[in-house]
């Protein structure tokens, strides 16, 4: 009897969990589209146009930090890396630069000196003194004698 009650209890527990999950789904509130900030505006503190505190460590001109489009029309030349490198890239058209000019801008590559492995792997196995009486070693000794004769004949 206790087994039946345990089975019924587990059944009710599973069913109650299903309804509990359905109830939680109805309670989720989704905000309006105006509540979400655009990715470009994340980090700006209000409409003042000043950069957030965590960006104060970067030394970039103030005209680049301002989110207002009117500030770009009043931009003055800056000595920062971003404006100097981008202005040189856009001042010269890609059709005006030749391949040789592009290759001239690339620094030369120095080769890496790797240590050379002077040891060559031998395909022959070394003879052991204990296996000299076996038929295999006698065959290898015959082969080595023939190779010895051919080497000697080449030298003479």
Swiss-Prot record:
GO terms for cellular component: cytoplasm. Keywords: Cytoplasm, Growth regulation. It is found in: Cytoplasm. Its main location: cytoplasm. Residues 78-96, 129-156 have a biased composition (Low complexity). Residues 68-77 have a biased composition (Polar residues). It comes from the Eukaryota. Residues 30-43 form the CRIB domain. Residues 117-128 have a biased composition (Basic residues). Expressed in roots, leaves, flowers and pollen. The keyword Cytoplasm applies. GO terms for biological process: pollen tube growth. Residues 68-156 are annotated as: Disordered. PANTHER family: CRIB DOMAIN-CONTAINING PROTEIN RIC10, CRIB DOMAIN-CONTAINING PROTEIN RIC8. Over-expression of RIC10 in tobacco germinating pollen increases pollen tube elongation. Functions as a downstream effector of Rho-related GTP binding proteins of the 'Rho of Plants' (ROPs) family. Participates in the propagation of ROP GTPase signals in specific cellular responses. Is involved in pollen tube growth regulation. This is CRIB domain-containing protein RIC10. The lineage of its organism: Eukaryota, Viridiplantae, Streptophyta, Embryophyta, Tracheophyta. The gene is RIC10.
């Amino acid at each position: 009897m206790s087994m039946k009650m345990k089975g019924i209890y587990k059944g009710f527990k599973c069913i109650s969990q299903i309804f509990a999950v359905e109830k939680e789904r109805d309670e989720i509130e989704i905000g309006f589209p105006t509540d979400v900030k655009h990715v470009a505006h994340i980090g700006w503190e209000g409409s003042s146009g000043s950069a957030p505190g965590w960006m104060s460590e970067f030394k970039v001109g103030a005209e680049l930090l301002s989110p207002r489009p009117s500030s770009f029309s009043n931009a003055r030349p800056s000595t920062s890396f971003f404006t100097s490198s981008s202005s040189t890239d856009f001042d010269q058209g890609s059709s005006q630069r030749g391949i040789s000019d592009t290759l001239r801008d690339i620094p030369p590559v120095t080769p890496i000196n790797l240590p050379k492995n002077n040891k060559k792997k031998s395909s022959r196995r070394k003879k052991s003194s204990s296996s000299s009486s076996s038929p295999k070693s006698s065959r290898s000794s015959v082969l080595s004698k023939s190779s010895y004769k051919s080497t000697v004949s080449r030298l003479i």
